[in-house]
Amino acid sequence: MKNLFRPLIVLFVVLAALTGLAYPAVMTAFGQAVFHDQANGSMLEQDGKVVGSKLIGQQFDAPQYFWGRLSATSPMPYNAQGSSGSNLGPTNPALLDEIKGRIDALKAAGTDMSKPVPVDLVTSSGSGLDPEISPAAAAYQIERVARARKLAPNDVQALVDRYTSGRQFGILGEARVNVLQLNLALDEMKRG
């Protein structure tokens, strides 16, 4: 009986060391060496201070900033610990109220409402934390942001164009604009 347990214990210790220590250590070292930025959360800095991550949206509701998608993590917007979809179906009155509330906020901020509102400005994403909007949603807000910052709309459009990322590998997903990066660039533009 003793001979039966010894190989099991040795196998357990070896596999635990391989899968619990060696493999995670090698993968961590590889990630830090090859994908340092991504392995550390894709953090963005301004003036030497971390202001956010490229991967998680932030709440912007002042007229001088581009607004991202609605957050589905209430009562604390963009709370990564509470990430989940809103689970509001198209017939749910709460979804309609949420959309109407965002449209009212866009109106109150002085957005030109003569054009159709891009859907990603009035709905939340699947995770509720999406940091990006479509180029159409960014273009929809250019006049408001330019007016609030006393900038030429063409200058703001050029900034949006510079921060628009195309499809991944040319085929995956859609073009998108990272709201935090764009707003940080706007703040830098104001300083410069």
From Swiss-Prot:
GO terms for molecular function: ATP binding; P-type potassium transmembrane transporter activity. The keyword RNA-binding does not apply. GO terms for cellular component: plasma membrane. InterPro entries: KdpC. It is found in: Cell inner membrane. The chain crosses the membrane at residues 7-27. HAMAP family: KdpC (MF_00276). Part of the high-affinity ATP-driven potassium transport (or Kdp) system, which catalyzes the hydrolysis of ATP coupled with the electrogenic transport of potassium into the cytoplasm. This subunit acts as a catalytic chaperone that increases the ATP-binding affinity of the ATP-hydrolyzing subunit KdpB by the formation of a transient KdpB/KdpC/ATP ternary complex. Keywords: ATP-binding, Cell inner membrane, Cell membrane, Ion transport, Membrane, Nucleotide-binding, Potassium, Potassium transport, Transmembrane, Transmembrane helix, Transport. It comes from Paraburkholderia xenovorans (strain LB400). The system is composed of three essential subunits: KdpA, KdpB and KdpC. NCBIfam families: kdpC, PRK00315.1. Belongs to the KdpC family. This is Potassium-transporting ATPase KdpC subunit. It is a single-pass membrane protein.
